């Protein structure tokens, strides 16, 4: 988690059903650890966000075994080539992931597409949790957040 807490910013990438999970992961890191993080659709990297990649920047890549897997891995290789430290979250085994220079890999259990989003979300929640703990923040009482939001 220090890679994320010490960085100027981080990026979360996903395609298909993993894109909203990437957004949620970035949001949780912002809400709990007060670290700048943004979620982006992996397929849109060449339209701007790729320019934000700096050497050592932490990037979470959600790459479940789905129709977008190969394209997501290609996007991951692009950010690695620009110096990003990639945390890959996938339901493929390390031996099946054909990419070198991945900083960390978290392999979740394989499940059907209805359940897989839950399995991909847990590592992101733990990342935010441990990042907040490392910085000494109260996980149960994030600043400026309420359990319910009402607008009148």
Feature-to-residue mapping (PLM):
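A SIS-like phosphosugar-recognition module
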Residues: 1-152
């Amino acid at each position: 988690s220090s890679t994320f807490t010490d960085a100027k910013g981080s990026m979360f990438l996903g395609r298909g059903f993993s894109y909203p999970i990437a957004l949620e992961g970035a949001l949780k890191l912002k809400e709990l650890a007060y670290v700048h993080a943004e979620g982006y659709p992996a397929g849109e990297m060449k339209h701007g966000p790729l320019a934000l990649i700096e050497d050592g920047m932490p990037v979470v890549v959600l790459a479940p075994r789905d129709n977008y897997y190969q394209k997501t891995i290609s996007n991951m290789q692009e950010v690695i080539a620009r110096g990003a430290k990639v945390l890959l979250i996938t339901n493929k085994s390390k031996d099946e992931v054909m990419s070198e220079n991945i900083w960390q890999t978290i392999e979740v259990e394989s499940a059907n597409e209805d359940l897989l989003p839950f399995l991909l979300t847990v590592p992101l929640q733990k990342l935010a949790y441990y990042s907040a703990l490392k910085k000494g923040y109260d996980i149960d009482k994030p600043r400026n957040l309420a359990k319910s939001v009402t607008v009148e």
